[in-house]
């Protein structure tokens, strides 16, 4: 059953976990996803929320430099394929023009199947 159907017609509480995309220093996407997969197989999860991590400049300089992270859609697609749990990419939409967001949504749906 798809996550949208689970939300519309819940038979039990819907569980969504948030997992940050791996940092470049964490190794390959495949190895990171394999580790996550073994953890997720031990519990019941309906979907995985993957946030888009951005530097926040509004509050001034960060004490710790933000690490470059994997593309959330690539990571989400990989987790869907390996774990079989739907991914939700939590995108920060205020940074782009509407036309660019429409292209992003179409690409996310068609290329990454999210």
Named regions from a protein language model:
Residues 1-114:
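Active-site beta->alpha loop and helix N-cap motifs at the rims of alpha/beta catalytic domains
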């Amino acid at each position: 059953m798809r996550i949208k159907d689970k939300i519309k017609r819940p038979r039990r509480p819907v569980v969504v976990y948030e997992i940050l995309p791996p940092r470049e220093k964490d190794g390959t996407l495949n190895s990171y996803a394999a580790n996550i997969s073994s953890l997720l197989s031990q519990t019941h999860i309906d979907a995985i929320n993957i946030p888009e991590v951005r530097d926040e400049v509004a509050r001034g300089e960060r004490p710790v430099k933000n690490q470059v992270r994997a593309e959330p859609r690539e990571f989400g697609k990989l987790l869907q394929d390996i774990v079989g749990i739907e991914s939700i990419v939590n995108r920060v939409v205020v940074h782009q023009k509407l036309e660019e967001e429409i292209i992003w949504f179409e690409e996310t749906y068609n290329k990454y199947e999210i």
